[in-house]
């Protein structure tokens, strides 16, 4: 599934993050899926999703260079497919 960077997203209420030295683990208590956020910057993006009007706004606020947005969009799409993040 592709993600619409112009839409607003948030961490699913059934998902919990656990910080790790290089990123974070995210466990979804509803579907029992475990995801790994591989970079601290991706952790920041996921945290900022709830406070921005779009995923693009969260990427910008996290300081992700525009050239890396496609990579981050793919990561966010995978998190959406796993129901870790939801559109709001």
Describe each region flagged by the PLM:
Residues 30-88:
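Long, charge-rich, low-complexity alpha-helical segments
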Residues 1-32:
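Long, low-complexity, charged/polar intrinsically disordered regions in eukaryotic proteins
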């Amino acid at each position: 599934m592709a993600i619409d960077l112009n839409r607003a997203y948030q961490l699913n209420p059934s998902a919990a993050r656990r910080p790790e030295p290089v990123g974070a683990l995210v466990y979804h208590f509803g579907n029992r899926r475990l995801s790994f956020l591989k970079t601290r910057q991706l952790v920041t993006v996921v945290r900022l999703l709830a406070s921005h009007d779009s995923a693009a706004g969260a990427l910008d606020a996290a300081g992700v260079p525009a050239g890396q947005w496609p990579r981050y969009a793919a990561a966010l799409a995978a998190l959406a497919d796993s129901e870790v993040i939801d559109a709001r």
